[in-house]
């Protein structure tokens, strides 16, 4: 990502305008039931399973053929509260390396308890997985294909002590 100079005061003014224009004191009920799954691309199914189930302790729930691309594997991990993290592989297609691009994934934040956060940090250390700690509550790491994952020791609906839901 390329950084461009910004007027921080103007950005905060714009955020305030957006809140005033679009946030309602009486927030309506969402039309959505939740996120069914988020799907990423895997270059190696077994390596991805070893990482997400073996290190991050997200149980593998299913391995099926991708209905849209014969020969492709679609597999799922339980990330709690009925949410799934899914992957596809695309054998024979050159999908290129992971890239953070406009419209693409910046990171996927997964809420864990403080106890799990400490435990998973120890497992990352033992496995030699590099990571960055932010604010004492976030661990940012990259999966085997380069996707950025955040393990966040804040409850669902909170972000760094602020209620966001």
Predicted regions and their residues:
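Helix-adjacent hinge/juxtasegments
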Residues: 84-90, 94-111
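Core segments of cupin and vicinal oxygen chelate
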Residues: 41-84
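Vicinal oxygen chelate
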Residues: 6, 44-46, 103-148, 153-156
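N-terminal beta-strand motif that seeds the catalytic metal site of vicinal oxygen chelate
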Residues: 2-46, 105-108, 112, 161-165
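A short acidic/small-residue loop/turn micro-motif
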Residues: 92, 155-158
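A short, acidic/glycine-rich surface segment
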Residues: 22-24, 62, 71, 92-97
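Residues that flank catalytic or metal-binding motifs in active/ligand-binding sites
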Residues: 34, 73, 81, 104-106, ...
């Amino acid at each position: 990502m390329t950084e461009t100079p910004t007027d921080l005061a103007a950005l905060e003014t714009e955020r305030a305008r957006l809140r005033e224009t679009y946030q309602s004191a009486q927030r309506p009920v969402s039309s959505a039931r939740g996120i069914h799954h988020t799907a990423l691309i895997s270059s190696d199914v077994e390596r991805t399973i070893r990482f997400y189930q073996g290190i991050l302790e997200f149980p593998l729930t299913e391995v099926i053929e991708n209905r849209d691309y014969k020969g492709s594997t679609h597999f799922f991990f339980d990330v709690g509260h009925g949410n799934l993290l899914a992957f596809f592989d695309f054998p024979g297609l050159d999908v290129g390396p992971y890239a953070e691009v406009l419209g693409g994934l910046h990171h996927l934040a997964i809420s864990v308890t403080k106890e799990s956060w400490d435990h998973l940090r120890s497992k990352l250390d033992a496995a030699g997985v590099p990571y960055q700690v932010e604010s004492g509550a976030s661990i940012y790491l990259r999966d085997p294909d380069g996707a950025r994952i955040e393990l966040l020791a804040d409850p669902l609906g909170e972000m760094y002590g602020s209620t966001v839901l």
